[in-house]
Each structure stands twice: as structure tokens, then as C-alpha cells.
Amino acid sequence: MASSPTVLMRLVASAYSIAQKAGTIVRRVIAEGDLGIIEKTCATDLQTKADRLVQVSICSSLARKFPKLTIIGEEDLPPEDVDQELIEDGQWEEILKQPCPSQYSAIKEEDLVVWVDPLDGTKEYTEGLLDNVTVLIGIAYEGKAIAGVINQPYYNYQAGPDAVLGRTIWGVLGLGAFGFQLKEAPAGKHIITTTRSHNSQLVTDCITAMNPDDVLRVGGAGNKIIQLIEGKASAYVFASPGCKKWDTCAPEVILHAVGGKLTDIHGNALQYNKEVKHMNSAGVLATLRNYDYYASRVPQSVKNALVP
């Protein structure tokens, strides 16, 4: 008789189904035509009805099934009676069939921290740049990102009426990453993906030092990591505070599971324990290959300006 799935694999299987539901909610809000936009701190820091509904859906669905989890979400929402339509109780069967890496087989529910970004790329969502948008559910153990799920609600949205809309990517360190086709960036090219809406002199100085052949300015940390694993960019360079732990936790897992690397600008691993500060104050540097080339070119002036 096969052993029952471990806590980690059950959690990932749930997160997959919950992320798929989240993608449906994101599309429904657009279809209904009222985004319910609120400015949180400034004109580039927005929250929509989709952010609010998806956060309630993800956090409530996870908390009901895994009550001992620590769940940290981007949006501050008042406690409310949850609409049952927002609850997802399913678990993706294909994930439950996968073996749990042995180093995680004895993990208890209370040892895990889940970082949730209900809508990564909110500004782009409000502007109709729908392929930039992702839903991110990252899972951390002992401060390290070990499993993650990314839903792209509008994947294929420009591929014609017969295309399947949306996809869900998932991964576990030691097992692999699934739901996409791994592709290398063009050999010998330095293609940088970076922020679309949070540019600064530091960001510009750091990118210039990389001697880029091309610079892609797009929204969403999840979207930028997907560009790396699908060969559209060589490095994600963001020499600035701004992105948070819920932006990087899930994408980092997917990248690391296929041999890539994500750190801060100093080369330090990011920490995801529940007490950690939410801001990635020393920026982000990520690559699928050739990490050392990009890390070696970060100017000392940039490092001096960004304190971990």
C-alpha cells in the first residue's frame, strides 16, 4: 500500500487548485468591467477588487485545510465572513502522486510559512497588460523558499479564441518545476528584464554596468522570472528596494528548481521566515545561467546604496 502524501505535497497540491481558482477570479473581475481600484500609498501602488477577492480566497482556503500554517499576504484586509464561492477545497491529483523529497518528508504544518501575492503586476492589470499578471503562492521552511505555485491567468490571451487561457506553474526543490517548457536565452546575449514602473538612477546604473544587448521593462516579479525560464531574458536586475517577500518566494523556487539562482544585489540568499521584514531592501538579482557574470558587474556604488 502506498504511503499517504506528506504535509508539503498536500499543501502544494492545494495551492495549485487554489491558484487555479484565483486565476478564474482575476479573469472574472476583468470581464465584469469594474476593477474597484484603490491607491494604497501612491499612484503606482494600487489594489483592485481582484487583489482583495483573491487574497481572501487563497488565505481562507489554505487556513481551513491547514489551520497551523503561518500565512502572510500582501493585502491588509479586515476579517470578514468569507463567501463560500471563494473557498477552494480541491487538491491537484497529479501533485499528490509525486514523491516528496526526503529532506521535507517529516515537515510539520506549523513549520511552514506561506507567502501570498494575490495579484503580482496590479498596475499592469489596471492598464490591460494582462500577460504581466501572476498569482503567487510561495512556501518556505526554516527561512528558505522550498515550494511554489504561479498562476498566469492570461497566458495565451493573444493566441486566438481557441487557445486555452491561463496556466499554472509549480515546483518543489529536489523534485523539479512543471507546467512550462524550459528554454535557454540566446547564447552570448545579455538581455536584462527589469522594472517597468519603479525605475531609478540606481536601477539604471546597475543595468548599464551589465553591458546589455537589450533591456525589457515589464511588470511583476513572477512575470520576470517566467521570462528567465522561457529564454526571453538572461537576467532579472532590480537594484532597488521595492519588491517584497511575497513577490519573490514562489518565483525563486521555480527558478532554483531548474538550476537558476536568485539573490539580493550583494549575492545574499533571501530569507522567508515569518519574523523577517517584508521588503527585499537590497534588491534582486536572478538568472537561469551565468549568474557570476552579472553578479560581478554590480557596481560597488550600487551595493553601498542598498543595505540588506
Curated annotation (Swiss-Prot):
Cofactor: how and how many bound: Binds 3 Mg(2+) ions per subunit.
Which annotated residues bind Mg(2+) 2? 117, 120, 247
The way its activity is modulated is described as: Inhibited by Li(+) and Ca(2+), but not by Na(+).
Q: Where is the active site?
A: 51 (proton acceptor), 122 (proton acceptor)
Q: Which GO terms describe its biological process?
A: phosphatidylinositol phosphate biosynthetic process
Where Mg(2+) 3 binds, per the record, is at 74
Specify the enzyme's EC class, one word.
hydrolase
Q: Which UniProt keywords apply?
A: Acetylation, Hydrolase, Lithium, Magnesium, Metal-binding, Phosphoprotein
- EC number(s)? 3.1.3.7, 3.1.3.57
Q: Which residues carry this modification: Phosphothreonine?
A: 122
Q: Which reaction does it catalyse?
A: adenosine 3',5'-bisphosphate + H2O = AMP + phosphate; adenosine 2',5'-bisphosphate + H2O = AMP + phosphate; 3'-phosphoadenylyl sulfate + H2O = adenosine 5'-phosphosulfate + phosphate; 1D-myo-inositol 1,4-bisphosphate + H2O = 1D-myo-inositol 4-phosphate + phosphate
What residues bind Mg(2+) 1, as annotated? 74, 117, 119
Spell out the family assignment given in the record's similarity comment: Belongs to the inositol monophosphatase superfamily.
PANTHER family from the entry? Answer: 3'(2'),5'-BISPHOSPHATE NUCLEOTIDASE 1
Q: List the protein's name.
A: 3'(2'),5'-bisphosphate nucleotidase 1
Record gene name: BPNT1
